[in-house]
């Protein structure tokens, strides 16, 4: 199966995507090309072949869409731009802020923004605890960033302008029993949602959390 067909079929299998699959597919393939090109010298991701990137990066990022709210999204610890860039490509009406302290990864994401002409993405090369929220944030999301406790502790200020409605979503693999036990009472877990990534057998869970109003 060629890359275009693999990606197209994977996108069609995601419920609630509500995007132009052909257009989104072509943009995601260009993004994969950029990751592959930069990966040889910048070590952006341990996933090396484009076929695996489709499943483990693109589709894995997009299965969250039915479970997040816009229009203002913050992606914490974006790395090579995941999940924020696929989300921004699928939801051009949303604004996505990518937070990444690593310079080479932030520079790469900026190049992706230029190459794909992404007007709804901004890159912040800073530690998340230094970020000052501007607009009301609707969703703060992280993928392979840290433990739940650390994610919430470092990011909680991002929702201070919208504390009643803002949600934190951590993308996890297996059910994170130990991490859940370590969450302090100021944070509550609203849902733990098992998600299926097309073409991937590994377990995936979304942990939906919020801060309590003071």
From Swiss-Prot:
Q: Which Pfam families match?
A: GidB
The record lists the organism as: Nitrosomonas eutropha (strain DSM 101675 / C91 / Nm57)
> Which gene codes for it?
rsmG
Q: Which InterPro entries match?
A: rRNA_ssu_MeTfrase_G, SAM-dependent_MTases_sf
Query: Which EC number(s) does UniProt give?
Result: 2.1.1.170
HAMAP family, from UniProt?
A: 16SrRNA_methyltr_G
Q: What class of enzyme is it?
A: transferase
Reactions catalysed, semicolon-separated, are: guanosine(527) in 16S rRNA + S-adenosyl-L-methionine = N(7)-methylguanosine(527) in 16S rRNA + S-adenosyl-L-homocysteine
Assigned protein family: Belongs to the methyltransferase superfamily. RNA methyltransferase RsmG family.
Q: Which residues bind S-adenosyl-L-methionine?
A: 77, 82, 128-129, 143
| Descriptive protein name | Ribosomal RNA small subunit methyltransferase G
UniProtKB keywords: Cytoplasm, Methyltransferase, rRNA processing, S-adenosyl-L-methionine, Transferase
Chief place where the protein resides: cytoplasm
Q: Which domain of life is it from?
A: Bacteria
- Localization: Cytoplasm
Task: Quote the PANTHER family the UniProt record gives.
Answer: S-ADENOSYL-L-METHIONINE-DEPENDENT METHYLTRANSFERASES SUPERFAMILY PROTEIN (PTHR31760:SF0)
- State a GO cellular component annotated for this protein: cytosol
The free-text function statement in the UniProt record for this protein reads: Specifically methylates the N7 position of guanine in position 527 of 16S rRNA.
Where is the organism placed in the taxonomic lineage, from the top? Bacteria, Pseudomonadati, Pseudomonadota, Betaproteobacteria, Nitrosomonadales
Q: Name one GO molecular function term.
A: rRNA (guanine-N7-)-methyltransferase activity
């Amino acid at each position: 199966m060629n890359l275009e067909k693999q990606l197209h079929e994977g996108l069609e299998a995601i419920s609630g995507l509500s995007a132009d699959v052909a257009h989104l597919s072509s943009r995601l393939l260009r993004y994969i090309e950029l990751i592959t090109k930069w990966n040889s010298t910048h070590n952006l991701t341990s996933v090396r072949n484009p076929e695996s990137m489709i499943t483990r990066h693109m589709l894995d990022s997009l299965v969250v869409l039915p479970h997040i709210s816009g229009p203002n999204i913050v992606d914490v610890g974006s790395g090579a731009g995941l999940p924020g860039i696929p989300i921004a490509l699928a939801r051009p009406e949303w604004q996505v802020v990518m937070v990444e302290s690593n310079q080479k990864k932030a520079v790469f994401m900026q190049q992706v923004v230029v190459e794909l002409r992404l007007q709804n993405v901004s890159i912040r090369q800073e530690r998340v605890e230094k970020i000052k929220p501007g607009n009301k944030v609707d969703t703060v999301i992280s993928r392979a960033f840290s433990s739940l406790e650390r994610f919430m502790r470092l990011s909680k200020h991002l929702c201070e302008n919208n504390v009643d409605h803002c949600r934190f979503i951590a993308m996890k693999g297996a059910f994170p029993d130990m991490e859940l036990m370590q969450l302090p009472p100021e944070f509550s877990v609203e849902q733990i949602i098992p998600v299926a990534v097309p073409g991937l057998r590994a377990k995936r869970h979304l942990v939906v959390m919020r801060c309590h109003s003071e």
